[in-house]
């Protein structure tokens, strides 16, 4: 996984005229230079979601951190992981536990990214989050680009 500095350096290399934007046609090359290997279908999906001729650094960071898999594959992997953590088998995870996972595992999020994400999450009175709804939100309903 590339560091924030490596992502920024990569973006600057592809930002040939130093205007803070990179052509959408360069997205695949930029991602590959950081070790991602998106298929053409995955790139077309991302380009369709972005719906723009160019992207900025914030959008590139978001795209880089997003898993490059189909929504069905993403959902299955995330649900399998949550089910493994769900000792009671009740389909929920505590808000505090989810925050810790997001801050510390895999491509960890920053505190501000976790706060933004948690604003979108429905939490029950006892602090529980239905992880199937959470996964569905991440895969289908959470904005790809922070505009």
Swiss-Prot record:
A GO molecular function held by the record: calcium ion binding
Matches recorded under Pfam families: EF-hand_6, EF-hand_7
Binding-site residues for Ca(2+) 1, renumbered to this chain: 15, 17, 19, 21, 26
Keyword Metal-binding included in the entry's annotation: yes
GO annotations of cellular component type: myosin II complex
InterPro entries: CALM/Myosin/TropC-like, EF-hand-dom_pair, EF_Hand_1_Ca_BS, EF_hand_dom
All copies of domain EF-hand, residue ranges: 2-37, 73-108, 109-144
Binding annotation for Ca(2+) 2: 86, 90, 92, 97
Domain of life: Eukaryota
Keyword Lipid metabolism in annotation: no
Keywords: Acetylation, Calcium, Metal-binding, Motor protein, Myosin, Repeat
Residues found modified as N-acetylthreonine: 1
Additional information: This chain binds two moles of calcium.
PANTHER family hit by this protein: CALMODULIN LIKE 3, MYOSIN LIGHT CHAIN 1, 3
Name of the protein: Myosin regulatory light chain
């Amino acid at each position: 996984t590339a560091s924030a500095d490596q992502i920024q350096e990569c973006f600057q290399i592809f930002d040939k005229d130093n205007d803070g934007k990179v052509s959408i046609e360069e997205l695949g090359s930029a991602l590959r230079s950081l070790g991602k290997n998106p298929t053409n279908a995955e790139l077309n999906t991302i380009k369709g979601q972005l719906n723009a001729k160019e992207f900025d650094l914030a959008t590139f960071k978001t795209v880089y951190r997003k898993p490059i898999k189909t929504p069905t594959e993403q959902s299955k992997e995330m649900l399998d992981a949550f089910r493994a953590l769900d000792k009671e088998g009740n389909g929920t995870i505590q808000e505090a536990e989810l925050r810790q996972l997001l801050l510390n595992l895999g491509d960890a999020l920053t505190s501000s990214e976790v706060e933004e994400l948690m604003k979108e999450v429905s939490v029950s009175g006892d602090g529980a989050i239905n992880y199937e709804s959470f996964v569905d939100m991440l895969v289908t309903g959470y904005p790809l680009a922070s505009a």
